[in-house]
Structure formats: structure tokens, C-alpha cells
């Protein structure tokens, strides 16, 4: 997809990493109801056991107050990563108003990710994930998720955002969020905002999954780049991690987004930006019939939810003046799926973004225009 590639050395190995990796959820006001709405240059490092993190105790009721206590960096001042922390970039990242992102994961000692259901991974207790945001190059926030032991029926993940000090000396947890953080247009989410999106997947993590870790060029020839002619995002860690024993049920091949050209781009975009809510068994299942998440068993565009559910789907709410269907082939201006992406009042997604994604809205518009009546 979109995004320049740069080479970054991580734990002694060169990985192709995206220089700009959008991933977030949108800020339109909720009126009626929002419910309807680079391949690696060298083998990535194996995720070894995480070292003990001193002050961190899985029995504490709350998480660390400072980012420096979360275990991301062995030396915070120099930003030296803790041994075992691995960078990754999703192949199909979520739009976040053009913010630049870095993502990291750390697995606990000797643990494996349960991949018996390849569409719904379960992470071991002790897993940690971080995502750092820069806006116009300015370090603004880092989000942290930490899976801890919890009673049955309760959320085992600590989820919080940390606002960076202006001098970059540390970042402080902000449970209630921070609007227009550090003088930017970027809003740091509250813990409630974190739950809004992350409760909708089986085990909280959205961007670390089968499709997101597959090589973004899986199934493409060298001549089969996306419509923009630029390399896709992603570090393509899936098969390397599988070979190194990080999964209970290792896949034997990358998972290929069906289709070619614009069709492939749109399906990938829906998966990364819409599918974690609009899917079977999601929190919107009873409110909306949209199914925009890819399944690892999808082999052709025609069997995907993006083709079988939104076309001529009667939506729960009519969008003014008379837009009532999910997708009307050939007519993006009559299609809620497109119009809500560009709306100022009923924007999809409803959290985490204030700016229309020109790439995403453009390819969705082109896709609808090309659909046969």
C-alpha cells in the first residue's frame, strides 16, 4: 500500500520498516448512531523470553505510571530496546491522520501465541505491546497494552496511553486522555477509548495477526504493485516467527489478500481499518450486517464479507438526504460505506481520527464506481 520504506537496524538485523504507518479509529460526532456503519531485508529476530521487569507485578491493580517502568527500553535515555522487544509494522495499518508510528511486542519467557484459530489469536499472560505516535515528527504519545492474569470474565489487559514530556525525558500515563496533546491536533485517548476498539477482538491486539504479519507482497509478482505503484506497508514477520517457534499452530505460508489491483487494496484497507468492529462475533454484529474483516480461508474477492454483505444492504439509519444502502454499485455518493468515510458528522471510524484518509476514501470510491450494477 502507501508509505515509504526505510531500513532500520533492530537487535542487529536490518528490517524494512514503514516511515509512515497510519493506524487509528475516527473523531466524527455521533448523531443517529455510529453502529452501521517492504518486506524484511533480513530474517527478523526471534522473540526470546522477556526478562523480569523489576517493579512490574502482575498482581497490581493498575499499571505503571511512567512509560520508563513498562519494560520497553533497557536504557530509556538512549532509547535502547529491552532484549526481546521486536518492532513490527502491520501490512494493512489503520489510518491515524498521518501520524508516524512505531510498534513493538514482547512475549513472556517460553510462551507461545495460541494460533489454533488463525483468525483469532490468543496471547500468553505477560505479553506487552506498545505503539508510539509522532505528529509532524514530534513525539506525542505511546500506548501500552499488558496482558495480566485476571479472574474469568474480566479484562486481563491493562490498556493506557502515556503522554510524552516536552523534553522527551519520559511519558506519563493519562487515564482520562488529553485533547490536542502538546499543541498538536492529536488527541491522546482515554482508557475508555482504548476499550472501545480493543474489546472487539478476541484478545485485544488488533494489528498483530495473521494478515497483518504476512508479507504485504504475498501473492504479488514484482509487476503486481498496488494502484499507486508504491510498496505496501509491513515487515512480513509471520513465517519467520512461525519457524522460530512463537506459534502453537504455525502457518506454512503467508496469507494472501484476495484479488489484484484496486480490489486487493480495498479488501486490505477494509480489513485493517474497519474489520475489527465490522465482523462476525463483533460488538456490532447485532446492529449491522457489515462484515469487512478478511478470513484466512477467503481465497477470492467474491467470498469476502466486503462483497457478500454491504452491496444493497439496507442500513439501520438513513444518511441525509436519502442515502440508505451500504453500497450502491457505480454510485459512491449513494453508498453509506463511502459517504461515512468522508462525513464531518457521522464519520467512520467514530474514534481516533479527525481527518479524512485521502488514500482510503479514494480507493473505496474507485472500487464502488467499478462494481457492476
Question: What label would you give each PLM region?
Answer:
Residues 1, 15-17, 22-57, 222, ...:
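Ser/Thr-rich, Pro/Gly/Ala-heavy low-complexity intrinsically disordered linkers and tails
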Residues 1-7:
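N-terminal secretory signal peptides that target proteins for export/translocation
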Residues 9-15, 360:
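Sec-dependent signal peptide hydrophobic core
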Residues 23, 125, 329:
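Short glycine-rich loop/turn motifs that provide flexible caps or phosphate-binding loops at active sites
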Residues 45-51, 120, 138-373:
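Sequence context surrounding c-type heme c attachment/ligation sites in exported
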Residues 47-117, 123-174:
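Conserved small-residue
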